[in-house]
């Protein structure tokens, strides 16, 4: 059994990612749903069951935020749990790592990193600028894989910076549900 823990801020893609590899390798999975979006995580399991995956292959546990520490401890300590996959904050990741270490369980942590983009001198500047802007501002930058550092070859740095400034000035912030606004207001 693999325990997967996915966050709220990209619930479909990150829960699917927590399930895909363990399932492809023939494992069953217990997905600890985020307390902020349990219905989304449960829906993924229901879709997989409807698609013929089989009863008990993907199991979803929902809980309140106050119960999270006890649920995590029990999932990790369970004798059938062989590995843990966690995507989320560095703070909670440290707790997961400590708990997994206590039970000698391997753990994969995908935490709030410093996701870099490297732009080489042969890059198409328009494409690079669009990729950096998307990576930095998609989901208002509130995802673990948001672009946080940009390393640009000295030969094109000035041009890149100029184009990135132009791009950021053109991005409108508003409610994404009310139009084509890639940057929502918090």
Residue ranges and their predicted role:
Residues 52, 67, 89-186:
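ALDH superfamily catalytic-core signature
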Residues 1-127:
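Rossmann-like NAD(P) dinucleotide-binding subdomain of oxidoreductase/dehydrogenase enzymes
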